[in-house]
Amino acid sequence: MSADIRFDSLKTIVPAVSRETADRLIAFEDLFRKWSKAINLASPSTLADLWNRHILDSAQLFPLAKEATRWLDIGSGGGFPGIVTACFLAERSGGCIDLVESAGKKAAFLRTAAGHLYVPARVHSARIESMWEKIETPQVVTARALASLGDLFTLAEPWLSDGAKALFQKGRDYQREIDESRVGWSFDLVKHPSAIDQASVILEISNLRRKTD
């Protein structure tokens, strides 16, 4: 797939995207493929369609909170959506994203990617719970393929209960996860259909509170 085709496909997700951001994302794809030969960053079955399955899928989050400058991505793994978001924030004055990843090799990759791409990302090689009091409440918390919705609420509660909103990407079982999480939590919810996978959604969560009854 040529750079022009990638750029055009990216514009269908983020119409106002610059060529500079697209070039960063293309460079990230190349770096990801290189590192994937040495460490397991993503399922091998998805590497053939890495641009669509991971990069475009991650890119669709940014327009949902495009005015936000302070982001946090938990369980960042191979950088989806964290490094992708950082590529967009690189052109935003004062923009920054914190990436939390407990696996040392993946955290090393994230640091390399952030430096290679010159993007405003801070990488924390730590468990999410250990960062509750160390990372200032962001405007947006993201997570992709990390845990059930209820478990994500527990992991992100200190930030979400302090005014941050969440953008969590979920697959076909999302409604069951929503129903189960409402047993212990109250929250406002907006469901955004995925532009990449018709069976998936992006759950926009705000005003999270733990139920006490």
From Swiss-Prot:
Class of enzymatic activity (EC top level): transferase
Compartments where found: Cytoplasm
Domain of life: Bacteria
Keyword terms, alphabetized: Cytoplasm, Methyltransferase, rRNA processing, S-adenosyl-L-methionine, Transferase
Disulfide partners: none
UniProt entry tagged with the keyword S-adenosyl-L-methionine: yes
Reactions this protein catalyses: guanosine(527) in 16S rRNA + S-adenosyl-L-methionine = N(7)-methylguanosine(527) in 16S rRNA + S-adenosyl-L-homocysteine
UniProt-listed Gene3D superfamilies: Vaccinia Virus protein VP39 (3.40.50.150)
Pfam annotation, one family: GidB
PANTHER family documented for this protein: S-ADENOSYL-L-METHIONINE-DEPENDENT METHYLTRANSFERASES SUPERFAMILY PROTEIN
Identification of the protein by name: Ribosomal RNA small subunit methyltransferase G
Species per Swiss-Prot/TrEMBL record: Brucella suis biovar 1 (strain 1330)
Gene name as annotated: rsmG
